[in-house]
C-alpha cells in the first residue's frame, strides 16, 4: 500500500469526523511531544466546561501508549480548550477499574478507554453508561461493552498486511511452501483475534501450512520468548517463516533465532513500526512491520471526544463494526494501515512518526539507513 493512499484514506476519514465537530478543534502537535508521567496528566479548560477522561492500557505491550497516544491526545484537548484527565492503567485491571470509577466520579462527559480485556472494559462502560457518559473504545473494541463509538485501524487489514508481507518475504527467500509459526497477541484482546484472522487467511491462501500456533498472555515479550523457544525446539527449528503479531513479539522471536544463528534467515513479521522494530527491518532480522499512523488515530479520536464533550453529535457518515458478543453494531471510524519493508522505512520517518537520529544509531544501522534512504 502506498504512502499516498495511506495519507489520502486517513485524511478523508478524518475530514468526515472533523466536519461533524462544528467549530471545535482537533489539532495536535507532533508525536515528539513529551509524554506525561506514568501516573498520567490532567488539564483544565480555560473557561471550564465538560471534561474528557482517557484510560490507556499499559506501557509494556507497546511504547506507543506513553510516547505517542498520551501526548497527542493531551495536546489536542488543550488546543481545543477542553479539560482532560489522561491516565495509564499500567497493565493492572484493578487500577483500570479504579481509574474508571475515579473519572466517573469526576463527572467526565466523555470517557475514552483502551481496554485491558473485554470483561473489565465492559464493566467500566456499563458504569459510565448508567451515568449518561458517552464512551469511546479507542484502538480496541470492547466486546460486550456499551461503547458509543469506536475509533481504530481496520485490524483485519492490519493482519492481512502482515500475512501478505510474510508471504512476500518467504517467497523472496525461495520458500514457496512450508511450515509457518504463528505467535499471536493476547487471547483477551479482540484486536489480536482480528489480526490473526487477517494473517492466517493470507498465509493459508498462499499455500503454506501452519504447524505451530500460540498466543502470548498480555502481549508479554518475556513470555513470548519462552513460548517461541518451546515452539522452535518442538519443531526442531523447521519453520520457513514466523508471523509475530507485533514488533515486541517479533523481537522475542528474533532473539531466539539469533541464539540459533538463524536471525535474518527465517522471515519474521511485526506491527506498530516501533523504533526497535524499524531497526530490525533495516537490519534484515525482521522482514516487515505494519505502520499505523497513530497521530491520525489520535486526531480522529480526540476530535470525536471534543465534539461529544461540547454537546455535538458526529454525522451518520461513520461506518460500523459488529460486536460479536452482543450482535450490536457500534458506530466506527476505521483507518488504513501500511505495510513497511526495508525500502519504505523512510516513509515512516517522512511522516514524522520517528526520526533518522532515533533509528540510525550504530555503524551497521547508519549503513542500512544510507542504503534505504532514511535521512
Task: For the regions a language model picked out, list residue spans one by one.
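Bacterial lipoprotein signal-peptidase II cleavage site
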Residues: 20-34, 38-41
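Flexible loop/hinge segments that line or gate small-molecule binding clefts
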Residues: 119-157, 164, 168, 173-179, ...
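Extracytoplasmic "Venus flytrap"
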Residues: 46-47, 51-97, 114-118, 184-194, ...
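Short beta-strand elements in bilobed, periplasmic/extracellular small-molecule ligand-binding domains
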Residues: 77-89, 178-182, 200-221
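Hinge/cleft segment of the Venus flytrap/periplasmic-binding protein
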Residues: 8, 48, 183-187, 191, ...
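Short, solvent-exposed amphipathic alpha-helices that sit
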Residues: 64-79, 158-165, 190-209, 227, ...
Amino acid at each position: 500500500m502506498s504512502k499516498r493512499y495511506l495519507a489520502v484514506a486517513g485524511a478523508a476519514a478524518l475530514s468526515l469526523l472533523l466536519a461533524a465537530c462544528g467549530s471545535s478543534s482537533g489539532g495536535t502537535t507532533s508525536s515528539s511531544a513529551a509524554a506525561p508521567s506514568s501516573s498520567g496528566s490532567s488539564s483544565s479548560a480555560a473557561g471550564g466546561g465538560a471534561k474528557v477522561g482517557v484510560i490507556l492500557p499499559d506501557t509494556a505491550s507497546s511504547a506507543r501508549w506513553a510516547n505517542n497516544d498520551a501526548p497527542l491526545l493531551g495536546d489536542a484537548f488543550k488546543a481545543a480548550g477542553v479539560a482532560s484527565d489522561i491516565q495509564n492503567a499500567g497493565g493492572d485491571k484493578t487500577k483500570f477499574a479504579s481509574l474508571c470509577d475515579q473519572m466517573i466520579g469526576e463527572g467526565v462527559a466523555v470517557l475514552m478507554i483502551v481496554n485491558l480485556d473485554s470483561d473489565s472494559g465492559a464493566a467500566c462502560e456499563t458504569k459510565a453508561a448508567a451515568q449518561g457518559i458517552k464512551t469511546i473504545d479507542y484502538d480496541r473494541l470492547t466486546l460486550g461493552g456499551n461503547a458509543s463509538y469506536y475509533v481504530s485501524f481496520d485490524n483485519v487489514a492490519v493482519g492481512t498486511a502482515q500475512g501478505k508481507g510474510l508471504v512476500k518475504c518467504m517467497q523472496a527467500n525461495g520458500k514457496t511452501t512450508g511450515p509457518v509459526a504463528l505467535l499471536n497477541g493476547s487471547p483477551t484482546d479482540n484486536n489480536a483475534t482480528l489480526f490473526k484472522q487477517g494473517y492466517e487467511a493470507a498465509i493459508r491462501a498462499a499455500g503454506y501450512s501452519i504447524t505451530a500456533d500460540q498466543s502470548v498472555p498480555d502481549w508479554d515479550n518475556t513470555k513470548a520468548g519462552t513460548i517461541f523457544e518451546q515452539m522452535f525446539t518442538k519443531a526442531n527449528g523447521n519453520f520457513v517463516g514466523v508471523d509475530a503479531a507485533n514488533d515486541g513479539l517479533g523481537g522475542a522471536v528474533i532473539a531466539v533465532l539469533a541464539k540459533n544463528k538463524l536471525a535474518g534467515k527465517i522471515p519474521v513479521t511485526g506491527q506498530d513500526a516501533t523504533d526497535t522494530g524499524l531497526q530490525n527491518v533495516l537490519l534484515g532480522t525482521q522482514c516487515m512491520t505494519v505502520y499505523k499512523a497513530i497521530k491520525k488515530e489520535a486526531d480522529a479520536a480526540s476530535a470525536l471526544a471534543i465534539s461529544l464533550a461540547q454537546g455535538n453529535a458526529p454525522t451518520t457518515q461513520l461506518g460500523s463494526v459488529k460486536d460479536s458478543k452482543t450482535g450490536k453494531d457500534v458506530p466506527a471510524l476505521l483507518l488504513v494501515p501500511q505495510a513497511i519493508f526495508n525500502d519504505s522505512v523512510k516513509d515512516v520517518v517522512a511522516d514524522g512518526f520517528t526520526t533518522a537520529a532515533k533509528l540510525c544509531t550504530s555503524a551497521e544501522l547508519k549503513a542500512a539507513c544510507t542504503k534505504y534512504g532514511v535521512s
